[in-house]
């Protein structure tokens, strides 16, 4: 008699910088979602795959939620996140720093209205110095979610992830596995490399040009020594933006190249050569009334 298998779709939601990318990477034991301390560097839903014996799930990293959204790009990301919540079997609701405000309540209300299975997870417990605040905070959340598990973890330190995984497995629907057991993500190398370069540049630029560049025409080759040879083009709207990305004496773009190489080599375990060219294409962006740029491609 064939044993039952379990498969489901999971999304991690929460504010910016609560550790969503770190948690995804630690659960699937692979660095597919690039981690940055700067807020809002995750713009796309990164999909990881976990498989262990009879259990398998897709797990989605999502852009960080905010109390206010300043442009149509941010608003679209959040609409996409809510749509994905609607399509998911289980929601991991990640919180930290004793923050429980309107956006958290709004997310929870949406999840409960859709009658979704969910787990509230308090992350970064290793950084909590005032332990006496923890119990009142848990009790506060419990008033909004009386029937939910509240699990305390440290994703970075891999503390109590086994408890989280046990709870996830209990909630997975019975279904056939979708992927081979060794697969960690649906994305190919080129996409992940593009994400690494994009997030590295966003980290270096911070708020200067967060939405005002596109990474295009990524070419990935391997030489006879299995070394990555990567070439990509960064497209900007005008000369001023190009100068900002290049930086004084080329320092910023050189940092982007060096930091990206380091992350690519760590992720793929391959020596890497990276070349970046910056081009100006004015028609790639259209300026909105609020002064923000929208990708018009």
Swiss-Prot record:
GTP binds at residues 14-21, 123-126. Keywords: Cell membrane, Cytoplasm, GTP-binding, Membrane, Nucleotide-binding, Ribosome biogenesis, RNA-binding, rRNA-binding. One of its GO terms (biological process) is ribosomal small subunit assembly. Residues 6-174 form the Era-type G domain. One of its GO terms (molecular function) is small ribosomal subunit rRNA binding. Its main location: cytoplasm. The keyword Cytoplasm applies. Residues 153-155 are annotated as: G5. Residues 40-44 are annotated as: G2. It is a peripheral membrane protein. It is found in: Cytoplasm; Cell membrane. Residues 197-282 form the KH type-2 domain. Residues 14-21 are annotated as: G1. Gene3D superfamilies: 3.30.300.20, P-loop containing nucleotide triphosphate hydrolases. Residues 61-64 are annotated as: G3. Residues 123-126 are annotated as: G4. It holds the Pfam family MMR_HSR1. An essential GTPase that binds both GDP and GTP, with rapid nucleotide exchange. Plays a role in 16S rRNA processing and 30S ribosomal subunit biogenesis and possibly also in cell cycle regulation and energy metabolism. NCBIfam families: era, small_GTP. Monomer. Belongs to the TRAFAC class TrmE-Era-EngA-EngB-Septin-like GTPase superfamily. Era GTPase family. This is GTPase Era. The lineage of its organism: Bacteria, Pseudomonadati, Pseudomonadota, Gammaproteobacteria, Enterobacterales.
């Amino acid at each position: 008699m064939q044993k039952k298998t379990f498969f489901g779709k999971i999304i991690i939601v929460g504010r910016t910088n609560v550790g969503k990318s770190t948690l995804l990477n630690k659960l699937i034991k692979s660095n597919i979602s690039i981690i940055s301390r700067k807020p809002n560097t995750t713009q796309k839903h990164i999909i990881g795959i976990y498989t262990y014996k009879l259990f398998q799930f897709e797990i989605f990293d999502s852009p960080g939620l905010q109390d206010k959204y300043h442009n149509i790009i941010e608003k679209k990301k959040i609409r996409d996140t809510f749509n994905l919540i609607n399509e998911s079997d289980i929601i991991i609701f990640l919180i930290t720093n004793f923050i429980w405000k309107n956006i958290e309540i709004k997310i929870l209300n949406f999840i409960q209205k859709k009658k979704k299975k969910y787990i509230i997870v308090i992350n970064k417990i290793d950084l909590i110095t005032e332990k006496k605040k923890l119990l009142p905070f848990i009790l506060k959340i419990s008033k909004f979610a009386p029937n939910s598990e509240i699990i305390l973890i440290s994703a970075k330190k891999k503390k109590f992830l086994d408890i989280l995984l046990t709870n996830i497995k209990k909630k997975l629907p019975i279904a056939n596995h979708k992927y081979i057991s060794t697969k960690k993500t649906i994305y190919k190398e080129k996409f992940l490399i593009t994400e690494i370069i994009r997030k590295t540049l966003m980290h270096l630029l911070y708020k200067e040009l967060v939405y005002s560049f596109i990474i295009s025409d990524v070419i990935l080759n391997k030489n006879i020594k299995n070394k990555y040879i990567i070439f990509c083009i960064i497209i900007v709207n005008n000369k001023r933006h190009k100068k900002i990305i290049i930086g004084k004496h080329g320092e910023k773009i050189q940092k982007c190249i060096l930091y990206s190489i380091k992350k690519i080599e760590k992720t793929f375990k391959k020596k890497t050569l990276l070349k970046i060219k910056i081009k100006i294409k004015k028609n790639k962006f259209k300026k909105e009334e609020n002064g923000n740029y929208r990708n018009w491609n």
